[in-house]
Amino acid sequence: MIFKKLIPLFIFFTILFASGGYDHGTSAGKGSWDISVTWNPFNYFEQGQSYAIFGYGLTERLDIHGYYSYTHRWNDNYYGGFSYQFYESNKIDLSTAIGIRKYRNEPTTHIFFPQLLYTLRLSDRIGIGGSLVDIRNQDLQISKGVAKDVFLTVKIFENKKYKVNFNLGGFQPIFWEPKTGQWYPTYSVGIKVR
């Protein structure tokens, strides 16, 4: 009974304080939502951003997915596309995806293709996820480079309706260079709603 009252409060604070990327190879599943939210509190982190990532299962293996990213440099961008989970086992899930990214304040369009997204299950509670994303110009002729992310995920709560994970990892961008080396540290809280 107390969990029913705490879940909405937990989800509210998760949305407020989550930060980081959350690409993985497991489909949301038909009729389910995967949501990850980032918040760069008061633009504290110079290279940080606030964004929301979503995935919705059209079928057991096909998702519509996307994100909206707010940057304090006033060049927000957004992405929409489809992902397809082509492999599933007890230990690993693999997906591919295609999508389009646009910027609000410039005419640049990028195609994210091909993409390889993966989930490795180390146990019932712990896994590794991430992605390799080839970012191309809009006519697909020129690759701008391959963005990478990898994270450790820990399941912190699950019931019939919700699943909540904490994720800690890194992101290797191609259009900017992190001040701390090649990888930018990330964290997020992912929520699955069935």
Roles of regions detected by a PLM:
Residues 5-15:
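Sec-dependent N-terminal signal peptides
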Residues 1-2:
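N-terminal secretory signal peptides that target proteins for export/translocation
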Residues 23, 32-34, 43-45, 57, ...:
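Outer-membrane beta-barrel transmembrane domain signature
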